[in-house]
Amino acid sequence: MSFSLRKLLVPILVLVLFLDLCVESGFSQSTPARDDHVHHHGGGCSHSHDHDHDHDHDHHVKKTTAKVEMKLPEELAEEEDMRLCGFGPCLHDHDHESSSTLTGFALWLNALGCSLLVSLASLICLVLLPIMFVQGKPSKWFVDSLALFGAGAMLGDAFLHQLPHAFGGGHSHSNDHHENHDHHDHSHSDSPSHSHSIQDLSVGLSVLAGIVVFLLVEKLVRYVEENSSGSNTWGHHHHHHHAGSKKLKDEGDHNNLDQQSSSDAIVNSSEKVSGGSTDKSLRKRKTSASDATDKSDSGTEITSDGKSDKPEQVETRSSSLVFGYLNLFSDGVHNFTDGMALGSAFLIYGSVGGWSRTMFLLAHELPQEIGDFGILVRSGFTVTKALFFNFLSALVALAGTALVLVWGNEPGQSSLIEGFTAGGFIYIAVAGVLAEMNNSGKSTLKNSACHLISLILGMSVALCISLIE
């Protein structure tokens, strides 16, 4: 009996050992297949691994083209962010020398030449001069429409172009990875924590700083005007008022004396004939002379030539000029950042990237410069001065381009500059142009419709440019 049991145990033990060996060999084959292959999550890597055990491994990652593409600085920043997150490109056989890079004198010539070309866009306003003038002076409705078009372009540029770039939300970053196996599915998703630091809020703070700085600049300019040229103007008018009044009063007294002496002579000579009527006419003459004297003393700002000058018009004119100067300042800062972007495009991607950036800036600046010109003329600048100062602020782009070329790359903090400029644009458009339009006389249905269409047209142009970009 024991011998028979022993005979049965031997095959059972052999079977168990065989199964154990099979199981171990199966794990030894499947484990290297899982551990030895490396997952390269790249910006354009799509690969599949076929093993003897039919283990298909497909990575669903967003594909990009394998060829070299000339990209703008914003796209470079996107690739740098992906590389820092561990999703760098898997193709290293790019021919970097094939891009038409520029060095030395050619780099400076192309970059500064394109920057000057963008600056010349401000002279597009010369085309508007034949349409703008009616009977030798600028048409009010056309100037108002240009100013509101500029305000709409400013608001659209601030909210649709500058702030998305400053906050880094202009491009979509996809960091979701999905892996499919035959026998199990698993997905990885990155969910960043909702915490804020000073660095995260720096762009928003720069926008608020731009609004506050432009408010302070406006207050400062108003204070200087009121205490320098304003006081001289008031003193000048006050002097003319008293001098003119004194002169008119002396002439009135002299005329009264002459009239009184002649009247006395008439009374003495013809006292018997018309005594009652003469007294009545004398009283009438004296009353009219005294009324003229009182009017000359209490009149409003009567000068030596008899014309009146209203101080309210002078105050309104100086108030509008302040926003004209603020517009020049903000436009200069904006053109400086455009020059920096143009210089970095030439420096990193050569002539192809630089010229593509130039074309975009031209499309971006043409409506902006037209609106700035309208705001300057609306603020009280003459047409010649508006053209000159607008072109002068456009030339600031050359300084931004030269700074990048000397520095060797973009010096950074461009997002803070973009935010600051956006804050200035918002302040000028809302507190300047729109507020002045609401306070400028009587509003009719026709004027309101024209103003609204001009404002929306400026915003629409900014939207189209942002979508094309």
Curated annotation (Swiss-Prot):
Localization per record: Membrane
Composition-biased stretches (Polar residues): 257-279
CC annotations in GO: endoplasmic reticulum; membrane
Biased composition (Basic residues): 235-246
Lineage: Eukaryota, Viridiplantae, Streptophyta, Embryophyta, Tracheophyta
Function: May participate in auxin metabolism or response. Probable transporter.
GO molecular function: metal ion transmembrane transporter activity
Gene: IAR1
Keyword entries, A-Z: Membrane, Signal, Transmembrane, Transmembrane helix, Transport
Residue ranges, compositional bias (Basic and acidic residues): 47-58, 173-193, 247-256, 292-315
Region (Disordered): 33-58, 170-197, 228-315
InterPro entries the UniProt entry points to: ZIP
Name of this chain's protein: IAA-alanine resistance protein 1
